[in-house]
A protein has these predicted regions:
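Alpha/beta-hydrolase fold nucleophile elbow
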Residues: 12-24
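Active-site nucleophile elbow and catalytic-triad environment of alpha/beta-hydrolase enzymes
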Residues: 79-95, 101
């Protein structure tokens, strides 16, 4: 909210419509900031989730087992004390219900960082029949590379194979220094992070539709 207020204070941005795009914790932030803003025209939530305590509980279980669940109320209390009720007593679902913005939800079924039960499934259950919402669910794009092209995926797979050969054929060890050396020599960032043109076109079309309303 503070970041948006800052942007709105800059004269050259004041006549522009506000649209949001967030991934993971950024997706959580996008959904929740809608509780505080009525001027957002459109928003995209990629691999996001509904409430922070859900993800804290999930990550706690991964690290410490089911017993971590008993600490969830204390973690929620810590968040409430540190960040205040304004930011912790809300959810993305509540924010999405308060806005008239066009919304796109993007997730992948195999996401193990933010499983779809904490985000996509909840959002679809609440808003699946709404014309304001577009839902994009992939099968196998994981968490970090949801919005990259098929060519980028293929390039990344080949890059990983080349890195393995670089290490083993030269008698090197797998370590951060060797990987950095390899990437500095061979990584083509434009190819590796090329966005998915089909998804980008859908996002731009939604932004255009809601920004002229």
């Amino acid at each position: 909210d503070d970041a948006l207020n800052h942007a709105a204070s800059i004269e050259e941005y004041q006549k522009l419509p506000l649209v949001l795009f967030g991934h993971s914790w950024g997706g959580y932030a996008v959904g929740n900031v809608l509780n505080m803003r009525s001027d957002i025209k459109s928003a995209v939530i990629v691999a996001g989730f509904n409430k922070s305590e859900d993800l804290l509980e999930y990550q706690g279980e991964l690290m410490a087992g089911k017993g971590a669940k008993i600490f969830t109320p204390y973690m929620a209390l810590y968040e409430r004390i540190k960040f205040g009720k304004k930011y912790t007593a809300i959810s993305a679902i509540e924010g999405l219900a308060k806005t008239d913005a066009g919304i796109m939800i993007v997730h992948s079924k195999d996401d193990t960082t933010v499983p779809i039960r904490y985000g996509y499934d909840k959002f679809y259950k609440e808003f699946g029949s709404s014309d304001r919402f577009e839902f994009v669910l992939y099968e196998d794009k994981g968490h970090d590379y949801l919005f990259y092209s098929e060519a980028a995926w293929a390039y990344r797979e080949q890059l990983n194979k080349d890195y393995k050969s670089y290490v083993e054929d030269n008698g090197r060890n797998y370590c951060a220094e060797v990987k950095e050396e390899f990437m500095n020599k061979y990584l083509d960032k434009k190819q590796c992070f090329e966005p998915d043109p089909i998804l980008m076109e859908r996002i731009l079309k939604m932004f255009d539709t809601y920004c002229v309303k």
